[in-house]
Amino acid sequence: MKILLAYPTRSSFIARDIKILASKHVVSEHSYYSLAPADLLRGFLAVKSCDLLYLWFASIRALPLVLFARMLGKPVITVVGGYEAANCPEISYGNARKWQQRIPTRWILGLSQLILAVSRASSEAIIKNLKVAPQKVHLLYHGFEDFARDDNSVKVPVILTVGRADSSGWIRKGIREFFLAAEQMPEHSFVYVGGVDIDIPEILGRPMAPNITLVGAVPFETIGDYYGVAKVYLQASHHESFGCSVAEAMLYRCIPVVRDAYALPEVVGNTGVTFSGDSIAAVVQALTTALKMDAGEGERARLRVLNEFSYEKRKSDLLALIEKTRIA
């Protein structure tokens, strides 16, 4: 079968789905980010030549492709991310906050034959906030290959966070907590891996703590160098539909410290430390507890990802869902 996989940008988890689908089908790709006439035409031609449209994110930018696919009688499978179904006015986040934003998303999901959610938290948000029939929503966790199998790095008491530091993520992604916790824990090293698009000292109103190292963006192929040595991984997000970087860190035996928010507790389960509330004291206490845990906790975190969120599990289930949708 010919499958068109459409997305705004090609992230690592989208690349994994491309690899899975290409193992059994002919896969072509299209970025729907640009709505320029030439790009729209390329998208329409790609839809015309495919048998099924597999869409990552129910974005308004993808609506023309979905409408055209359904006009041609071709099935659509949509994977919903975090933003589309979120309704979080307290952090000014989510497509479901306003009816003007909800309508295009609901059109896309209404035209889709199958909707995939990457966590139970996401599934519940899709059903509740976007009024989607539960029978259309299928839970399919992200799947991770064991790329840390041969890692023998020696852990050091470093606290790591990975992600882009920008104005939209300062509160939502818990970047603020990373920098403020570092101020309260001067005896420990904090490492931030990812692009920095904001003036952090200006936001803080003071210089950055000297125990913080900003690495900058690194290729996915080398990020394991940082996961491998850090004992603790901090994800203080207020909203995550899953939290792929947390799972990747857990594969490298990092002990996860996460906020009790949306899908994060679902990912870490009973491993690591989960904190509640907005106080920096709670973050510091959670980090202190994690740093005192022995290496066995990191191994438990790794095994959780391998057992619950394996690449082979996602591959098997996704290919079966594709076949079921094709037959229907």
What is each model feature region?
Residues 96-115:
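Membrane-proximal helix-turn-helix segments that form the acceptor-binding/catalytic region
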Residues 238:
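Aromatic "clamp/platform" in nucleotide-sugar-dependent glycosyltransferases that forms part
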Residues 272-280, 288-294:
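Conserved acidic donor-binding segment of nucleotide-sugar-dependent glycosyltransferases
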Residues 110-149, 158-164:
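Donor nucleotide-sugar binding/catalytic pocket of nucleotide-sugar-dependent glycosyltransferases
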Residues 201-224:
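Nucleotide-activated donor-binding/catalytic signature segment of Leloir-type glycosyltransferases, i.e.
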Residues 255-258:
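Short hydrophobic beta-strand element within catalytic cores of glycosyltransferases
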Residues 151-185, 191:
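Conserved donor-binding/catalytic core segment of Leloir-type glycosyltransferases
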Residues 295-308, 317:
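A short, well-ordered alpha-helix in the C-terminal region of glycosyltransferases
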